[in-house]
Amino acid sequence: MLRKGICRLIHQVSESSKKPYFLTTPIFYVNAAPHLGHLYSLVLTDAIARFQNLKPDVSVISSTGTDEHGLKVQTVAQTEGVSPLQLCDRNSKRFADLAVAANTKFTHFIRTTNPKHQASVQEFWKTIQKAGMISFERHEGWYCVSDETFYPESAIQKVVDPATKQEKRVSMETGKEVQWSSEMNYHFLLSKFQSRLIEHYNKNPNFVQPSIFHTQVLEELKTGISDLSISRPKQRLSWGIPVPGNSQQTIYVWLDALINYISVIGYPWLNEKSSLSAGWPANMHVIGKDIIRFHCIYWPAFLMAAGLPLPEKILVHSHWTMNKVKMSKSLGNVVDPFWLIEKYGVDTIRYYLLKRGRLTSDSNFDIEELEKDEEHDLRRSLGVLLSRLQSKKLFISNEIQKQWHKKDDFTEYEDIVHELIELPVVCAQSIDGGCVYEVINLVQSVLRRVTKLFQLKEPWKLSDDSQEKIDTLMLVAHSLRISGILLQPIMPTKSTELLDQLGIPKNQRSLQNATNVFEPTEFTFHSGNNSHLFDKRTQ
């Protein structure tokens, strides 16, 4: 019987462990205001963290924050006539406010201007210097101010500036202009880690996901990597953390920034046991595709040099565009994330971004598409189904519900029941790969099928003691219950409202509860509190 199939369901839950599940967003650069891409990184990471929280005996640590040093911050502050710290204080608050507005539940918010972080960075420097992985020598190369990095000759190209008609050199990766620079810097001996990095990538095929990015990094490693400049002369860059033992040099902003992932949980640790209890190694870093090299080559090499374990997984996502063009203030196609949340509501925006956002390809922001998703997926599919279930004509007593839960023959509804059985497991697999959009598509598939069943059976026309009516309503109720549980990481507020209206106790909303398709539940039918889950939008 299908009941046996339910019992054999593999629960994808983590065993109780002393090590918390730790995942991170990139920390955001404070030279400009938050944009849609920042919001997507926040809600994607938060949704994955919330899904982990649905598992029993799992402690979750999640961090976000702001990257506040470097030449760009120093330059913008000078332009605005404020101190770098004043600029950082103002803009860091905007990112913290966005995290709150997006209803994210990060346990840590880090700022790289925090003295504890700066102490961690200097300790890390001393560790890799003691390991013999830092040299001091003249560095010459093509430097990009906006990217704050040196590029090798092979990574630049000549182009003609359309405005000036003059030839210039730009980064092939970012398109930003580069200039020749020659100065004394500290260097990290990155080239010494080429073979170790390649070996790690070969042994851990899921280290960078999706696989297209794993392959991309591996190919870059095979072509060879050069030693990396990790400091700048103080006379050129004063806004940053001084190199230990040489106050005339400032630590490279990317080395500083990457260390946030360990400083936020207390690095340096006393021993391996204390690092594990703090959360390291991280289970997942979530990053945008524009910072792959820093996270997938530099960061693992830095950790190897310091004798620290590497993160379990680096999840890469693509960008958001408008009209298929990268968002830019000069083009007037920038969307204010605060305005979006204010106008459409946080759960609708979270749902839209997580449904439409992709990992391997850029996603195009479209207001009409957003409103279509809100109308069809949320109001008509989820909202209307809940509203219909709570009609006065469709009441089922608790006694009848208790008798129904003893039933073990669902042959007539076999396809839907099988889909419900598989739903939590497949959703867990999708979350593990960072594909939150697949969770939404899977849930919507179930809701569409159940809606068709509801329309086909027309339970409002059947007598109260009709077994067909009871079966239909209980199947719809459990489908909404399971959908509500699985949508909690995506739409925390609306999912809570849905489960509240169904009468699901707070302690019965875990992944384990979702895996039991017909878990004995006393649903609230026609409670009198069945307000519309999604009100009709007024223009």
Curated annotation (Swiss-Prot):
ATP binds at residue 329. GO terms for molecular function: ATP binding; methionine-tRNA ligase activity. SUPFAM superfamilies: Anticodon-binding domain of a subclass of class I aminoacyl-tRNA synthetases, Nucleotidylyl transferase. GO terms for biological process: methionyl-tRNA aminoacylation; mitochondrial translation. GO terms for cellular component: mitochondrial matrix; mitochondrion. Pfam families: tRNA-synt_1g. Gene3D superfamilies: 2.170.220.10, HUPs, Isoleucyl-tRNA Synthetase, Domain 1. Its EC number is 6.1.1.10. It comes from the Eukaryota. InterPro entries: Met-tRNA_synth (IPR014758), Met-tRNA_synth_2 (IPR023457), Methionyl/Leucyl_tRNA_Synth (IPR015413), MetRS_core (IPR033911), Rossmann-like_a/b/a_fold (IPR014729), tRNAsynth_Ia_anticodon-bd (IPR009080). The keyword Protein biosynthesis applies. A motif ('KMSKS' region) lies at residues 326-330. Keywords: Aminoacyl-tRNA synthetase, ATP-binding, Ligase, Mitochondrion, Nucleotide-binding, Protein biosynthesis, Transit peptide. A motif ('HIGH' region) lies at residues 28-38. It is found in: Mitochondrion matrix. It catalyses: tRNA(Met) + L-methionine + ATP = L-methionyl-tRNA(Met) + AMP + diphosphate. Belongs to the class-I aminoacyl-tRNA synthetase family. This is Probable methionine--tRNA ligase, mitochondrial. The lineage of its organism: Eukaryota, Fungi, Dikarya, Ascomycota, Taphrinomycotina.
